[in-house]
């Protein structure tokens, strides 16, 4: 259950309190490709305030506390964070630098330079396929800093609703062979069918595709929640985690689905 648009530290507590075991956070960049704020801006989902904003490194420090066992702010249930990287403001040739700078920020402020940092799994979600060098920059930086082991905690997604075969080709270019979460969706203000979600699920289940997990966004209605579960998604991104919890407790779903814990491997495709 992925809490949507969690861009302030107070919202971490709020969304986990409502039932989220995962959050999605928007990351804006400055002109030099430095991650700057956790901020979505206008327009955003209907019924939500678009203006929550935190300095990126301050958010990382708070997130670290929320995902470090023993800390007073620790939430055992919070195990996955999707960074929705707003790289649309950057030139294509800045993608590598953005990845480098993102890695350095996470290493210092979230992973505490490898010394008992936050334990959550991280997904780097990129809107444009031609920004795939962000992945390269991120990976090479962690390796160069002597912390390549942390890549075990990092997964990937492209959020642009591109053709699945194009996504697959882009991962090949980026040297990505696993840890792939494929999203599909649209703002809650509009309706979208499930055909692309079903194509992503088929790729996931084919055994020959690159996708490990599929999630759908932004799912706020009970009917859409049921439709998503019927399509066999792995994750639901929502503004109302308590509604997702309610549906998961219905007889039709409570035997088939459960909320993931830290012991579950987010990079392993679930086999029925």
UniProtKB/Swiss-Prot annotation:
The active site is at residues 4, 40. GO terms for biological process: killing of cells of another organism; lipid catabolic process. Mg(2+) binds at residues 24, 26, 84. Binds 1 Mg(2+) ion per subunit. Pfam families: GDPD_2. Its EC number is 4.6.1.-. One of its GO terms (cellular component) is extracellular region. It comes from the Eukaryota. Expressed by the venom gland. Its cofactor is Mg(2+). It catalyses: an N-(acyl)-sphingosylphosphocholine = an N-(acyl)-sphingosyl-1,3-cyclic phosphate + choline; an N-(acyl)-sphingosylphosphoethanolamine = an N-(acyl)-sphingosyl-1,3-cyclic phosphate + ethanolamine; a 1-acyl-sn-glycero-3-phosphocholine = a 1-acyl-sn-glycero-2,3-cyclic phosphate + choline; a 1-acyl-sn-glycero-3-phosphoethanolamine = a 1-acyl-sn-glycero-2,3-cyclic phosphate + ethanolamine. One of its GO terms (molecular function) is phosphoric diester hydrolase activity. Disulfide bonds join 44-50, 46-189. Dermonecrotic toxins cleave the phosphodiester linkage between the phosphate and headgroup of certain phospholipids (sphingolipid and lysolipid substrates), forming an alcohol (often choline) and a cyclic phosphate. This toxin acts on sphingomyelin (SM). It may also act on ceramide phosphoethanolamine (CPE), lysophosphatidylcholine (LPC) and lysophosphatidylethanolamine (LPE), but not on lysophosphatidylserine (LPS), and lysophosphatidylglycerol (LPG). It acts by transphosphatidylation, releasing exclusively cyclic phosphate products as second products. Belongs to the arthropod phospholipase D family. Class II subfamily. This is Dermonecrotic toxin LvSicTox-alphaIC1aiii. It comes from Loxosceles variegata. The lineage of its organism: Eukaryota, Metazoa, Ecdysozoa, Arthropoda, Chelicerata.
